[in-house]
Amino acid sequence: MSRPTVVLVHGAWADGTSWGPVITDLHQAGIPVIAAPIPLTTLDDDVDAVKRTIDRTEGPVVLAGHAYAGGVIGATSHPRIKALVYVVALAPDEGETVADVFYRDPPHPQAPELKPDDNGWIWLPHNAFPEAFAQHATADDHALLAAVQRPINVPCIQKPVPRPGWKEIPTWFLIAEEDRMINPDTQRFMAERIGARTHTHTVDPAPLISRPEVVTAILSEAVQSVATT
């Protein structure tokens, strides 16, 4: 079996650069890695974008998603996906929407108010990056995140998902104890429900930026598991 490739999927208000530190770590470890750019237009569009990225790879795939992208990776069906890694991510069950699980528990007091603009796109206020999205990251990180953020279209979070891959595929979950975007209680509920190999850390909602070594360690564990299966 060829060495697994890690396919990384960014969440809302981000692009592939959000995985930059993790990509560097994986590359230095000799683990093949590629980031999937998703349009954040509809759930189906995002799933199709991930499938196109997987088609560019060879061999088994460890598919990882951050935040909103948990809904995307669970809905992505591809014969070469051998592991799913939820990085502080949402994991709706069949018939649920991303919004259903996101709003399952009360929001953090510093969580931003999320509402669409006149065209149906949801943007993150710039002050939310240092206050809630990545409070442990640097000021330079916050400036970059705000500058490159990509809005998410409302239909992405309103469509019920199909039978998710986590029902059949080995799954890992990183819980962020200091998350101000997705309630940690919601994360614990999802991790238990999907039967994930769970890692809990005192990190913010964006550890792929603020604590990439934590994320890399979990991805490496998944890669090793697939490689020895």
What do these predicted regions represent?
Residues 64-73:
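Gly/Ala-rich beta-loop-alpha elbow adjacent to hydrolase catalytic centers
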Residues 80-126, 153-160, 190:
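Flexible "cap/lid" loop of the alpha/beta hydrolase fold
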Residues 2-59:
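Active-site catalytic motif of lipid deacylating hydrolases and related acyltransferases
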Residues 4, 166-171, 194-196:
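Short, proline-enriched alpha-helix->beta-strand connector loops that line the catalytic pocket
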Residues 56-59, 167, 222-229:
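Glycine-rich phosphate-binding loop signature in dinucleotide/nucleotide-binding domains
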Residues 173-175:
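Short beta-strand/loop motif that positions the catalytic acidic residue
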Residues 119-165:
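Conserved alpha/beta-hydrolase catalytic His-Asp/Glu region
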Residues 177-209, 221-222:
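Conserved loop-alpha-helix segment in the C-terminal half of the alpha/beta-hydrolase fold
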